[in-house]
Regions:
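Alpha-helical linker/hinge and terminal dimerization helices associated
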Residues: 7-8, 43-44, 65-87, 290
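Short helix-boundary/capping micro-motifs
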Residues: 12-27
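Alpha-helical residues within the helix-turn-helix
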Residues: 24-25, 42, 63
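Residues within the DNA-recognition helix of helix-turn-helix
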Residues: 29, 36-39, 110
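Conserved amphipathic alpha-helical core elements
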Residues: 40-41, 249
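A short LG(V/I)-centered, amphipathic sequence patch enriched
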Residues: 41-58
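Central regulatory/effector-binding core of bacterial HTH transcription factors
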Residues: 91-151, 302
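C-terminal regulatory
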Residues: 134-136, 148-262, 289-302
């Protein structure tokens, strides 16, 4: 029988767009990926990819192969989910996906007591600022801002509401002054996101339109975004919990307040596992106990 994993290597190249990116994703060397693809193409008698300046594009045959390879991956993931679901023991590994802002700070502290109470359960935190694919077992549990979404196989519970407001460094205020109304923000430098508005941006006093922004600094991670505000690049919207933990930030225009709901999400089958269900419920309980921390930035209970 042909090696099924060759098809998954082919799928990784198609999704990553290059041999190098696929090798990094799979955790193997580029020559290994090349060798596996060559073996597959030799069996087929024609190429699966066209290679051009380091990029790999699917041939007509390649598109057909990838369609089947995706179904193979889905079925393999379904087998893994079924095996995990029937395991009710409180042992094994639980992989939790979270954004940088949560996974590097609050989540490890929240899980410490869980691991002490369940020493046979190992914890792995996967930092992802994009959405982990729970159906493909990229994680067992995910902390998400948008809930389970429209995928019916996912279940989620809202754990906390994360409040946010306008902040600037004292050094910026000393140099540029503080805005006296949301409309004044049009005359200030702003710290934004390169991945779209995370918490949103104030509308004008009339409410007819969003206040124009002069963005002086952009970032695609919460830590870098916060550092931009701290460094004095301008005014930015950040969560109260991050702002209160930072030195030298001043809240501006407290009448402007916004928030996002933070959800805990899992695949409905995987959540039946004893260890996953226990970790899921623990995270929810810790979020609820820390509601003032998330909503207003008050000291954490952890």
């Amino acid at each position: 029988m042909d090696d099924w994993s060759d098809y998954l290597v082919c799928l990784a190249v198609a999704e990553a767009g290059s041999l190098t990116a696929a090798a990094n994703q799979l955790g193997v060397s580029q020559p290994t990926v090349t060798r596996r693809l060559q073996a597959l193409e030799q069996r087929f008698g024609e190429p699966v990819f066209e290679r051009d300046q380091g990029q790999s594009r699917l041939t007509p045959l390649g598109h057909k192969v990838i369609a089947h390879a995706k179904r193979m991956r889905e079925e393999a993931s379904a087998i893994e989910r079924a095996v995990i679901a029937q395991d009710q023991s409180l042992s094994g590994l639980v992989v939790i996906s979270a954004s940088e802002g949560l996974g590097a700070d609050w989540l490890p502290r929240a899980l410490a007591s869980f691991q002490r109470a369940n020493p046979n359960i190992g914890i792995e935190i996967a930092i992802k600022n994009n959405t982990a694919n729970l159906a493909d077992r990229e994680a067992d549990i995910a902390l998400r801002w948008n809930g389970p979404g429209t995928q019916q196989s996912l279940i989620g519970r809202r754990g906390a509401t994360v409040g946010a407001g306008l902040y600037a460094a004292q050094s910026y205020i000393d140099e540029r002054g503080a805005p006296q109304s949301v409309d004044d923000l049009a005359d200030h430098a702003c710290v934004g996101w390169s991945i779209g508005d995370f918490f949103g941006w104030p509308s004008s006093i009339s409410g007819s339109a969003v206040v124009p922004r002069n963005i002086s600094f952009k970032a695609n991670s919460p830590a870098s975004h916060l550092k931009g505000i701290e460094a004095g690049f301008g005014v930015g919207v950040t969560s109260h919990r991050l702002a209160r933990a930072s030195s030298g930030l001043v809240r501006l225009l407290p009448e402007f307040s916004t928030s996002l709901d933070l959800w805990v999400v899992a695949h409905e089958t995987v959540r039946k596992s004893g260890r996953v269900r226990a970790a899921f419920d623990h995270i929810i309980a810790q979020m609820q106990a820390d509601s003032a921390y998330f909503t207003r930035g008050e000291p954490s209970t952890l």
